[in-house]
Amino acid sequence: MTIESGRIRIFDTTLRDGEQSPGATMNLQEKIRLARQLETLGVDIMEAGFPASSQGDFEAVQAIARAVKGVEVAGLCRAMPADIDRAWEAVKVAENPRIHTFLATSPVHMQYKLRKEPDQVVEMAVAAVRHAAKYTSNVEFSAEDASRSNPDFLVRVFEAVINAGATTINVPDTVGYAQPEEFGRLIRYVIENTPNSHKAVFSVHCHNDLGMGVANTLAALKAGARQAEVTISGIGERAGNASLEEIVMALHTRRDFYQLDCGVVTEQLFPTCRLLSMIIGQPIPPNKAIVGANAFAHESGIHQDGMLKNRETYEIMTPESIGKTKTDLVIGKHSGRNAVKNKLDELGYRLEEAQLVTVFEAVKKLADKKKQIYDEDIEALVLEEVYRLPDLYRLVNLSVQCSDTGMPPTAAVVMDVMGEVKRAAGFGVGPIDAVFNVIGEIVGRAPVLERYSVTAITGGTDAQGEVTVRLRQNGSSAVGRGSDPDIILASARAYVNALNRLAKKEEEQEKEGI
C-alpha cells in the first residue's frame, strides 16, 4: 500500500486494549465522549472494541462507529468466521470501517493455546483474512506474540495474508518481551523479506511489561513500520501499552532524528489525557512524561535560573504545545446559560438541550459553594450529571456529625432506591466509613472497598475534591467517582456511583449468561 514515506498512522486502542486496564471500565456515553475527543485529537484509526466479546461491547462499537467522522473505526476479532461477521456488523456503519483480526504465531502459543501446527496456523490466518476481505478492503492482520515468533515464519504468514487481502500487517510485542534494538531488527527483517510487503502498511503494538513500550515502538518506526498502535496515557492490560502522547511528542520534538510525522493535534494531548483520567477515575501521575503535573516544573535553583534566562535551557517542548495552558476562570456566580454553553462547546461537549439545562443548574449550584469555576470543574460536572448510568440508587440527602469527645462519627442518609425513598443512620470509625456503612445498609449491599482516593480538581481551599472508589462484590468490580467541595459528600456520591456501576455490570452479566 502506498503511503507517504514519512507519515505515521496513529492507531488508538484506548477504547479496546486500554479499557482492559483494571478499573478503567467505561459506560457507553463515556466511550462516545472519549471517541469524539480522539476524533478531535486527530488519530487516524480508533479501535472501538471487541464486538464478539459481549452484546454490550457490540453496541458500544456500533454506537462509536456511527458517532465519529473522518477517522477509521476498527473492530477486533479472532480469526474465526463468527467473530469476523460480528465485527463487521458493528463497524459497517462507520465512514471508514476496518476489520482487525488476529492469530497467535509464536511456538508457545501455537503449541499450548491453539494446539495447531504451523501449517494449520497459516491456513487459519489466510481463511480469516479472506473472509474479512469479503466485507471490506480495509483488513488488518495481527500476529499475536510476534516478538517471540520465528522471523521466517512471520514472513511466511505475512506474505500469505497480504495475498489474501490484508492491507495492514501488525507485529505486536504482546507480552512486552522485546528490546528496542532487537525489535527494530525484527521489523526491518520482516519488511525486507516479505516479498509483497509493499502492498501493506506495517504496524506495531507494544506492551510495557519491561517498560519498553515506547522505546520499542519508536525503534520499529525508525526501522520502517508506519503505523503505531497506542493508548492514551499508556493504559492497558497488565503494565499497559505504548503511550500515545509520548510517541507523538517524541516524533514531534525529535523530527530531526526520526524524519517522521503524524496528524495528531499536539495541543489536544493534555486535554485528552485529562478527560480520560476523569472518566476512569485514575489521576495522572505527577511524574508522567509529557502530561504529568511535574513535566514542566523546575525546582532546582540552577534549572530555575536557566529557565529565567532562556526557556530552551531546560525545556525541550512547551506546555502550550501539548495544550497545557494556565487554567483560566470560565464561569462565575452570575454567568448565564450562553456562557456555559459556549464553554461546553469549547471543551468539545455536544449536549442536547435537556442535558445543557441539567449541567447549567449544576454549575449554578456549584457557584454558590465556590467562588471560581474552571474548565476542570465543568468537565467533572458533565461527567457526573450527563454521562452517568441510569440510577438504581440515588443519594437524596446526607448529614454527618463528628466530635472530638470520643463519640464515633454518625451519618444519616436518605436515598432513592429504585423509586422508593429509604432512610437510615449509623456509626463508623470515621465520617466516610459511617457514610459508606449506612449507604450499604440502605441498598442491602456490603461490597469490599478496594481503593479510595481523593484529588483536588483545581487549586484553592474551596476547590472541588474528586473522589474515586473501587468496589468488589461477587467477583465483579466497579469504579465510581464523585466530586464536590465537601469531601464527605463527594465520597458518598462516588460510593453510590460505584454501586450503580456494580449493579449494571451484574445485570449485563446475567443477560450474557455469565
Curated annotation (Swiss-Prot):
Gene Ontology biological process: L-leucine biosynthetic process
Sequence positions that bind Mn(2+): D17, H205, H207, N241
Functional description taken from the UniProt entry: Catalyzes the condensation of the acetyl group of acetyl-CoA with 3-methyl-2-oxobutanoate (2-ketoisovalerate) to form 3-carboxy-3-hydroxy-4-methylpentanoate (2-isopropylmalate).
InterPro entries in the record: 2-IPM_HCS-like (IPR050073), 2-isopropylmalate_synth_dimer (IPR013709), AIPM/Hcit_synth_CS (IPR002034), Aldolase_TIM (IPR013785), LeuA/HCS_post-cat (IPR054691), LeuA_allosteric_dom_sf (IPR036230), LeuA_bact_synth (IPR005671), PYR_CT (IPR000891)
Family: Belongs to the alpha-IPM synthase/homocitrate synthase family. LeuA type 1 subfamily.
Taxonomic lineage from the root: Bacteria, Pseudomonadati, Thermodesulfobacteriota, Desulfovibrionia, Desulfovibrionales
A Pfam entry, by short name: HMGL-like
Listed name of the protein: 2-isopropylmalate synthase
Keyword terms, alphabetized: Amino-acid biosynthesis, Branched-chain amino acid biosynthesis, Cytoplasm, Leucine biosynthesis, Manganese, Metal-binding, Transferase
UniProt-annotated location(s): Cytoplasm
Domain Pyruvate carboxyltransferase span(s) in chain numbering: 8-270
Pathway note: Amino-acid biosynthesis; L-leucine biosynthesis; L-leucine from 3-methyl-2-oxobutanoate: step 1/4
EC number of the protein: 2.3.3.13
Cofactors: Mn(2+)
